[in-house]
């Protein structure tokens, strides 16, 4: 099974830059709960669980960290799909996730306008299921990725909106 992520950056969610901060806990628990369901299905079907992240700050990194935290399950494979070389390379967890990744794909040598959209389409094309950490606003990259997944007939699982309210 192949699971992708689309979700907002920490600023839009009103959350700290560090995705391991306790304020991220409700979202991290939701991700882990969803991944646990997929692990069961994959185990029953004797297949790997492939996780696809775009490596943007916020939801993408939180998803990758959750996947890596389940390292005791050998069948989990982390695929980091970057729109361009060195994308988000100053992020606190960049080097750690690069070391843990099964696959590290840089879709372009340089950043260009629209390269994020190419990365998002790559993830939609690869995944069977898309987890969406979305605030409900029909604008921006997360919304466009959801629309791409809908048009492609992908299963989409939405993070409950009550978890997105920064308390």
Region locations from a protein language model:
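Acidic/glycine-enriched connector segments
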Residues: 1-166
């Amino acid at each position: 099974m192949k699971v992708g992520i689309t979700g907002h950056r920490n600023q839009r969610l009103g959350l700290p830059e560090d995705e391991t901060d306790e304020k991220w806990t409700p979202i991290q628990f939701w991700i882990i709960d969803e991944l646990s369901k997929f692990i069961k299905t994959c185990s029953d079907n004797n297949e790997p669980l492939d996780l696809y992240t775009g490596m943007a700050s916020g939801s993408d990194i939180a998803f990758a960290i959750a996947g890596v935290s389940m390292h005791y399950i050998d069948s989990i494979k982390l695929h980091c799909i970057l729109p361009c070389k060195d994308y988000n390379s100053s992020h606190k967890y960049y080097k750690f996730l690069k070391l843990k990744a099964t696959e590290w794909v840089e879709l372009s040598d340089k950043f260009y306008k629209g390269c994020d959209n190419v990365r998002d389409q790559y993830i939609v094309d690869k995944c069977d299921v898309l987890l969406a950490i979305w605030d409900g606003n029909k604008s921006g990259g997360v919304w466009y990725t959801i629309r791409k997944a809908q048009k492609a007939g992908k299963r989409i699982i939405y993070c409950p909106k009550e978890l997105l309210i920064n308390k």
